[in-house]
Every structure is written in structure tokens, then in C-alpha cells.
Amino acid sequence: DFLNFYLKRLEPNGIGMLSLDMPGIGYAEHWPLVQDTSRLHQAVLHYLSEVAWVDHQRIAMVGFRLAGNVAARLAFIEPFKLKTVVCVGAGVNQVFTNQELFAKCPRMMRDSLANRLGADAAQWDGMRTKCQVFSLKTQGLLGTRTSVPILSIGHKRDFICPEQDVRALAAASRNGKAIVFDKQPLLEVYDKALDEIVEWLKQHLCT
């Protein structure tokens, strides 16, 4: 999906892409998922400033779901290294702090989180307690403001990123924008979200 996104949407607009695995999966499986969810990506962000052929004044980060948590976190703690951030359906607060929303997590998501945390997926109450630290509001970030413009995209019926979180994320940034979809089919919404992402990146990176 990300290769197609790059080839069909980013490359034609002169935008490069570097894709990173989240801690606990893929090539980053030896990195445990901890409260500092962004430490791996932050290290890469610092490294890019030393790469001669990368314009470190025009770096953006796009994150989907839990990766949106990482992108949003870096918008707050690395405002001078990011030109803009895009978060899509990002789990940033309520899914980790609201017991009813956390209980909606499907089994596959529970197993994935447990694996990254080194926890037992069957011990759901313990899992919920451990995951509360991933809330950017609990961390004291969401509720402050960042100078990095954030495009926050979500769906009205998404339990991982409720509309309130979508709008709170955009409101916490300078010239941020919230887009909340409310229609089916999801594939159509997904394509529209990709269109919005590209236009946002062009606006902030190519002008």
C-alpha cells in the first residue's frame, strides 16, 4: 500500500518517502513498545538532518493508527525538525483511557499490542492499564500546543480515534486542520483521505 502511495501520489509531486516499522514489528521487532513510542522514529529524524541529499527543512511525517500516535508525539517534542504532520485514525487518547472504547479492540489488535508489550493478551485489565501511558493527554502533550501544522483525519464511527480526538489534535497545532468522514464505503473514504494527504503535503512541502 505504501509503495503504491509513493509511486502514484508522492513521486509525481517530487516528494520522497521513507517507511519505518513500528516498534515491536517487522525490522523493528527488537524494539519494545514503551511509553516513548516515538524513540525509534525520533532517532531516524535526527539522522536525516545529517544526510546531505535530504532537505531537512522540509520533512513531514504521516502516521496511520498507532503510527499516528508517533507522528503526533513528534509534532510536540520535535517542532523544529518537522514541517508538518499527518495523522490518520490515530490512537492518541480516548482508546487508551476510556475503558469502553478499549474493550472494543478486536482480538487481533489485542494480540498485537500484547506481543509488542511483552504482555499476556488474556490479561485484558492488565493490558488496559499498561496501555494508558500511550495517551498523549496522559503524557501531558495533547492539551498543549505545537507550532507544527497537523492534518488530523478520522471517521465519525471510529472507536480508535473518536471525532473528539481528531479535532483535539488539529486544534493543538498551528494552522491545523481536522477532517472527519461520515460515509461508506470505507474504500472510497480511504482514497479521499489519501487525496487530502497529498494536497496537504504539497501545500506545506512544495511551496
Which residue ranges define each predicted feature?
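Hydrolase active-site cap/lid region
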Residues: 76-131
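Catalytic active-site module of serine/aspartate enzymes centered on a nucleophile-bearing elbow/loop
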Residues: 182-183, 187-207
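Conserved alpha/beta-hydrolase "acid-adjacent" motif
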Residues: 159-165
